[in-house]
Regions:
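Non-catalytic cell-wall polysaccharide-engagement segments
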Residues: 2-36, 40-44, 61-62, 79-158
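Secreted/periplasmic proteins that engage bacterial cell-wall peptidoglycan
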Residues: 33, 46-71, 76
Length: 158
C-alpha cells in the first residue's frame, strides 16, 4: 500500500507542470504585463522585449513588488515621478506602473539614444549614466538587461 501511494505521488510530481517561463513567450511575467509591454512599446516606439527584460530584472514579474520607495513591475518611485504620473493620469502606481516606466524610458531615449546609457540612467540616474558613459563603462545592470532583451527578441523571432 505504501509503495502504491509513493508511486502515485511520484507520478503526480513528475507529471505536474512546473511554472517558470511561459513556453509561448519565454518569460515568467504575466500575460497582462506582457500585453502592456506590447501596447506601450508600440505607443512609445520601445521594444516590448526591452520592457519585459526590465520587468524581469526589477521585480521578477511581481506586480506589487516594493523596494524602498520603488514599486511595481518596473520599480517606479512615486517620489521622483509624481509629475509624470499626474500628466499621464496615473493615480495608482501599481496599476499604471508599466506606462510610467515606459514614459520615463522614452524621455531617456530622447536625451540619449544609446541603450546602455538609457538603462544606466533608468537604474542609477542621469548623473551616474553620464559618469559611466564618459569612462566608457557599462553597468552590469545595463549589460544584463540588454542581453536579456536581445535573447527575448530572438526567442520571439525578431
Amino acid at each position: 500500500m505504501k509503495k502504491a501511494i509513493a508511486t502515485v505521488l511520484l507520478l503526480a510530481a513528475v507529471l505536474t507542470p512546473v511554472t517558470t517561463a511561459s513556453a509561448e513567450n519565454d518569460t515568467w511575467i504575466s500575460e497582462e504585463a506582457q500585453e502592456q509591454c506590447i501596447t506601450y512599446g508600440e505607443e512609445y516606439g520601445i521594444c516590448p522585449e526591452l520592457l519585459m527584460a526590465i520587468i524581469e530584472q526589477e521585480s521578477s514579474g511581481q506586480a506589487y513588488a516594493e523596494n524602498g520607495s520603488c514599486k511595481g513591475l518596473m520599480q517606479v518611485s512615486e517620489k521622483w515621478h509624481k509629475d509624470r504620473m499626474e500628466r499621464l493620469g496615473v493615480t495608482d502606481i501599481f496599476e499604471g506602473n508599466v506606462l510610467v516606466g515606459t514614459d520615463y524610458l522614452a524621455e531617456l531615449f530622447a536625451e540619449n539614444d544609446d541603450l546602455y546609457w538609457v538603462l544606466m540612467a533608468y537604474n542609477g540616474g542621469v548623473d551616474y549614466a553620464n559618469r559611466m558613459y564618459e569612462a566608457e563603462k557599462y553597468s552590469k545592470y545595463a549589460v544584463s538587461i540588454a542581453n536579456r532583451s536581445a535573447e527575448l527578441e530572438r526567442l520571439h523571432g525578431k
